[in-house]
């Protein structure tokens, strides 16, 4: 491999000749050989959005030469297109302020932008700190990139996946709204409802989760940029934060604003913690939905078996013909991971000391992982399971007919205690509810048939 020599305030460093990063990126690569968790590409792209916006804001304020600003913006555009993805090699496990990832972007942009200017016969050079990082600190850029990355991830990945699953389940709810089945509470038989009503509960969970996620995501639209080192804004123009936020808004199509209190923006990550709490709520709902699906599909002969789900792959290496609810299993594991991520984020967010929280990389890494897993998990569950959910009408009817809880319909007519006598006798002697009612001489057959109609038990009755 060929190398070139780069320099920083600590001296010379050998850097791969085919890469645009500089000395500080190389030092980070050598000093933090920890794990395989790279800084998420969404953070890299958010930094490109930010550096493009800061260059244009500095240009508007007269703090950066127009030629330099345009060269920086051009390189950032290429980064956003994925042209230099292999120039961002750093892991999450680095300085807690994210300084090395900030400098990684500064160095790549500066070196490539300088090369662009040379191609245009310009004698200007672009410095990673003085030009690309002008009016900025890692302490305000990294939290800004965190918020930009988080908001875009929610809207570009999570919301489409959530909407798709929600809409398909809504179609199922409407299609199966006339199929009366037995309800279950405490894992025991309960009064009837329709399969459509049961699924409609899942739909409403997803609707509420989306509402909570979007409301929480709005909290992350306030950006730290302009606070520089400790929140005072030293070395930045008073209007810098607002101008950068305007540029980011233009570029992304999402509304961002300058945080009203930069001291809070640097040292606290309560907003992203709050937003991840909404992701955890979605994970809890998905855990419940996936569990319901696999319980309802359990069997095929000795389980509940009231719905049929797609058979995607063999389920056992020893039991021939076995097929398992693998999409539900994958989704429940994802939900467990999101709950673990929430614990990590909550603890990390509590560790802001004085003017700066230095757990930033692990916070955004876990947040973006949660969005990725939830999005991919919902897409997979949708494509390989939800679209193929069908009712097993024969089993549904058999379970409904055998349920003792249909006796609840008799409460208004013969009272709770007499209804309980019927249920207990039926259970003890293996009778139907009708047979037990007749044996106890509490009702005639005609009265029982008129009072116990499962289809009339699925809605309120005056």
Swiss-Prot record:
Residues reported in the UniProt entry to bind substrate: 97-99, 127-130, 137-139, 185, 317, 322-324
Localization per Swiss-Prot or TrEMBL: Cytoplasm
Annotated keywords: Cytoplasm, Lyase, Tricarboxylic acid cycle
GO cellular component: cytoplasm
Site entry: Important for catalytic activity: 329
Functional pathway: Carbohydrate metabolism; tricarboxylic acid cycle; (S)-malate from fumarate: step 1/1
EC numbers for this chain: 4.2.1.2
Pfam families: FumaraseC_C, Lyase_1
Catalytic residues (UniProt): 186, 316
Domain of life: Bacteria
MF (Gene Ontology): fumarate hydratase activity
Keyword Cytoplasm set for record: yes
GO biological process, one term: fumarate metabolic process
Family according to the record: Belongs to the class-II fumarase/aspartase family. Fumarase subfamily.
Quaternary structure note: Homotetramer.
Note: There are 2 substrate-binding sites: the catalytic A site, and the non-catalytic B site that may play a role in the transfer of substrate or product between the active site and the solvent. Alternatively, the B site may bind allosteric effectors.
PANTHER family (alphabetical): ASPARTATEAMMONIA/ARGININOSUCCINATE/ADENYLOSUCCINATE LYASE (PTHR11444), FUMARATE HYDRATASE, MITOCHONDRIAL (PTHR11444:SF1)
Purpose of the protein: Involved in the TCA cycle. Catalyzes the stereospecific interconversion of fumarate to L-malate.
Name of the protein in its database record: Fumarate hydratase class II
Taxonomy of the source species: Bacteria, Bacillati, Bacillota, Bacilli, Bacillales
């Amino acid at each position: 491999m060929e190398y070139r020599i780069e320099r920083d305030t600590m001296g010379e460093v050998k850097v791969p000749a085919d890469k645009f990063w500089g000395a500080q990126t190389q030092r980070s690569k050598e000093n933090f050989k920890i794990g395989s968790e790279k800084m998420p590409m969404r953070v890299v792209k958010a930094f490109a959005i930010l550096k493009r916006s800061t260059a244009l804001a500095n240009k508007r304020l007269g703090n950066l030469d127009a030629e330099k600003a345009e060269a920086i913006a051009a390189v950032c555009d290429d980064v956003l297109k994925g042209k230099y993805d292999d120039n961002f090699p750093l892991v999450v496990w680095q300085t807690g302020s994210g300084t090395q990832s900030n400098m990684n972007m500064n160095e790549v942009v500066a070196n490539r932008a300088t090369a662009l200017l040379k191609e245009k016969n310009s004698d200007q050079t672009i410095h990673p700190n003085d030009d690309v990082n002008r009016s900025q600190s890692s302490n305000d850029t990294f939290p800004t990139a965190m918020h930009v990355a988080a908001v875009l991830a929610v809207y570009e990945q999570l919301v489409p996946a959530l909407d798709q699953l929600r809409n398909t389940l809504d179609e199922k709810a409407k299609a199966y709204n006339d199929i009366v089945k037995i309800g279950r509470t405490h894992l025991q038989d309960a009064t009837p409802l329709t399969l459509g009503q049961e699924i409609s509960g899942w739909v409403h969970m997803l609707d509420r989760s989306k509402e909570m996620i979007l409301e929480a995501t709005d909290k992350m639209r306030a950006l730290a940029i302009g606070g520089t080192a400790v929140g005072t804004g030293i070395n930045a123009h008073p209007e810098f934060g607002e101008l950068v936020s305007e540029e980011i808004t233009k570029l992304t199509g999402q509304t961002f604003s300058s945080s009203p209190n930069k001291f809070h923006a640097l040292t606290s990550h309560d907003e992203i913690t709050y937003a991840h709490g909404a992701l955890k709520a979605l994970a809890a709902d998905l855990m419940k939905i996936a569990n319901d699906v696999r319980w309802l599909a359990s069997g095929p002969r000795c389980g509940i078996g009231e719905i049929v789900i797609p058979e995607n792959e063999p389920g056992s290496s020893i039991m021939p013909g076995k097929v398992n609810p693998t999409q539900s299993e994958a989704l429940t594991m994802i939900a467990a991971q999101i709950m673990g991520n929430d614990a990590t984020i909550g603890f990390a967010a509590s560790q802001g000391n004085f003017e700066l929280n230095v757990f930033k990389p692990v916070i955004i890494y876990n947040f973006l992982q949660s969005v990725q897993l939830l999005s991919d998990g919902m897409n997979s569950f949708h494509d390989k399971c939800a679209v193929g959910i069908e009712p097993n009408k024969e089993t549904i009817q058999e379970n409904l007919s055998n349920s003792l809880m249909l006796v609840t319909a008799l409460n208004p007519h013969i009272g709770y205690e007499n209804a309980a006598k019927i249920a207990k006798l039926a259970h003890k002697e293996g009778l139907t509810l009708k047979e037990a009612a007749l044996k106890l001489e509490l009702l005639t057959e005609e009265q029982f048939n008129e009072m116990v109609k499962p289809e009339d038990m699925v809605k309120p009755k005056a």
